[in-house]
């Protein structure tokens, strides 16, 4: 038993990895070193204790025409002769292949360099230098180019990356690299985009008598949009068309229009958004105006979705373009028409998530990102709306099923309206477990449209130029004193310019002699507005040209009378 226990303990030591199990003779090491170049690389790498790039602002998001600064840190175990260090600034596009046969191989990736600029920061290949053991720091700075750049992107089908790379070269050994990626964002201003037109889709029941005539008239008035969701659904609804109207045509839905739609059994849906561009984190308000031919309600009648369409081109065959759709966020609202007018106005909101890519168009090269606001109208009570996890939206069973997307809601639920029961959900915004729009489009009496929007990085407010107004010229403004408002208020209470001039002379006791003061047009502008007054200007000319002797004599007489009333001082 004692020998068996010793054997078990020895086996346990061997399984744990005792040092004796990994001993390699020096002869084997020398022979491997002479045969393998990988050992040479590891031998060069064994000299390095630390080799990294430290940016001065690591977490900063950079923009074009800015300068990146940092330090290359190198800590060596001992002296290394004949080395040189290069610094490279690289930007690269990369595409991933969808072919499962080439997954994991070099053919599964295709890359193209946006730019590559390099320079030597220590030594050169023609003139290598010596590095002593210890820590070395090499500061650097490189400017980001301002042309032909796009924002940093990393998604399933590809990526756009930018980084700073340091290369340590030595003679007869492969170089050693270290990288430091950074985020680049190209500013896209959405403040200059124009206001979009109102888009309208009109559906007509197949039971209508003048179905064909009505549809032909609508098609002549406006052209259908191939991007709209209604294009593949009109065959099921009997007839429909999409019209793009101006802002003035949105107010034509009166009683006569409603009666005409009721006679033709036509449903008219108009969608309006305030602008075409939005920034990351903003809300997209979507206003939907529905005119029905009868009273209608559905707890999930309107679904608005922010959709990203990605088009990836094949670099080896530019004619092959793959299109991918991704739903970013979604808004659901109930549809209830008024019992009398059969109309409804619903406001939905879509908030652009913070991790959304900006709109991108690389001119048929690599990939493109376009965003659309897609609105679907469910015009049948029989159509049930489900999410991707088969959760019923707007049904009686949703009251007992917890909604995982409630914590992602961007605004509070609206109050119940009309015949809405407690179990039906009100308008809400989803960021996960979205409604399966493709499944909903296959149902009857479902139509929709889409409006392209631009997702940018910022919005600059451009104030409109104010109309020109008549103002004082700069010469007359410079002549006005600082207390011109106080002088103007005092002069406005005077009875006439003559009385004002007399009061001014009478109350000036300690100043210079009033006889030397002669009023001119410039003096009078201090007391009156700059606008010319004909009556006052005529009297002012007469007053300026007359003699001031009468006013001066009265002043002297008053001063003499005041001195006579004073008692004379006794003589000394």
Curated annotation (Swiss-Prot):
Signal sequence region: none
A single cellular component GO annotation: cytosol
GO annotation terms (biological process): ubiquitin-dependent endocytosis
UniProt-recorded Gene Ontology molecular function terms: protein-macromolecule adaptor activity; ubiquitin protein ligase binding
Top-level taxonomic group: Eukaryota
Record-linked InterPro entries: Arrestin-like_C, Arrestin-like_N, Arrestin_C-like, Arrestin_domain-protein, Ig_E-set
Gene3D superfamilies for the chain: 2.60.40.640
Residues in coiled coil: none
Region (Disordered): 221-257
One Pfam family it belongs to: Arrestin_N
Low complexity composition bias: residue spans: 237-257
SMART domains, per the entry: Arrestin_C (SM01017)
Family stated for the protein in its record: Belongs to the arrestin family. PalF/RIM8 subfamily.
Function: Required for the proteolytic cleavage of the transcription factor RIM101 in response to alkaline ambient pH.
Protein name: pH-response regulator protein palF/RIM8
Source organism of the structure: Kluyveromyces lactis (strain ATCC 8585 / CBS 2359 / DSM 70799 / NBRC 1267 / NRRL Y-1140 / WM37) (Yeast)
């Amino acid at each position: 038993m004692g020998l068996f226990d010793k054997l078990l303990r020895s086996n346990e030591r061997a399984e744990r990895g005792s040092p004796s199990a990994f001993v390699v003779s020096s002869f084997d090491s020398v022979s491997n070193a002479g045969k393998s170049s990988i050992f040479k690389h590891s031998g060069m790498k064994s000299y390095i204790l630390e080799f990294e790039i430290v940016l001065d602002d690591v977490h900063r998001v950079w923009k074009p025409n800015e300068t990146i600064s940092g330090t290359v840190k190198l800590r060596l175990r001992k002296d290394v002769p004949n080395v040189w260090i290069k610094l490279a600034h690289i930007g690269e596009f990369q595409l991933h292949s969808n072919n499962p046969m080439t997954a994991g191989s070099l053919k599964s990736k295709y890359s193209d360099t946006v730019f590559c600029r390099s320079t030597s920061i220590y030594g050169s290949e023609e003139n290598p230098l010596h590095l002593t053991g210890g820590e070395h720091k090499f500061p650097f700075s490189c400017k980001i180019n301002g042309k032909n750049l796009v924002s940093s992107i990393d998604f399933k089908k590809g990526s756009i990356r930018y980084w700073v790379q340091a290369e340590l070269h030595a003679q007869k050994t492969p170089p050693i690299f270290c990288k430091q990626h950074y985020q680049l964002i190209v500013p896209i201003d959405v403040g200059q985009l124009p206001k979009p037109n109102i888009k309208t889709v009109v559906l007509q029941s197949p039971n209508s008598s003048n179905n064909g005539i009505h549809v032909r008239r609508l098609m002549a008035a406006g052209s259908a949009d191939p991007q709209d969701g209604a294009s593949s659904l009109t065959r099921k609804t009997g007839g429909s068309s999409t019209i793009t109207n101006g802002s003035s045509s949105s107010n034509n839905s009166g009683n006569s229009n409603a009666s005409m739609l009721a006679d033709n059994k036509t449903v008219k849906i108009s969608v309006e958004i305030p602008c075409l561009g939005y920034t990351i984190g903003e809300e997209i308000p979507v206003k939907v105006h529905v005119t029905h031919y009868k009273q209608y309600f559905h707890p999930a009648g309107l679904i608005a979705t922010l959709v990203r369409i990605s088009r990836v081109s094949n670099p080896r065959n530019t004619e092959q373009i793959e299109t991918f759709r991704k739903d970013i966020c979604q808004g659901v609202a109930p549809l209830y028409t008024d019992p009398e007018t059969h109309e409804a106005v619903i406001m939905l909101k879509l908030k652009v998530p913070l991790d959304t890519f900006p709109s991108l168009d690389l001119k048929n090269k690599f990939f493109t990102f376009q965003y659309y606001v897609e609105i679907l109208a469910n015009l049948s009570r029989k159509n049930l709306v489900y999410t991707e996890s088969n959760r019923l939206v707007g049904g009686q069973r949703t009251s007992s099923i917890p909604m995982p997307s409630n914590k992602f809601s961007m605004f509070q639920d609206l109050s119940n309206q009309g015949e809405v029961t407690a179990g039906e959900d009100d308008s809400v915004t989803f960021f996960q477990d979205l409604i399966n729009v493709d499944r909903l489009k296959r149902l009857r009496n479902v139509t929709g449209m889409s409006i392209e929007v631009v997702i940018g990085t910022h919005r600059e407010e451009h104030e409109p130029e104010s109309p020109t107004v008549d103002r004082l010229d700069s010469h007359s403004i410079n002549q006005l004193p600082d207390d011109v408002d106080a002088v103007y208020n005092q002069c406005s209470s005077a009875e006439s310019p003559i009385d004002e001039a007399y009061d001014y002379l009478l109350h000036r006791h300690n100043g210079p002699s009033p006889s030397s003061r002669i009023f001119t047009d410039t003096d009078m502008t201090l007391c009156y507005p700059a606008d010319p007054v004909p009556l006052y200007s005529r009297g002012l000319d007469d007053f300026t040209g007359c003699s001031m002797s009468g006013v001066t004599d009265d002043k002297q007489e008053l001063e003499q009378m005041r001195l006579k009333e004073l008692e004379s001082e006794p003589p000394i």
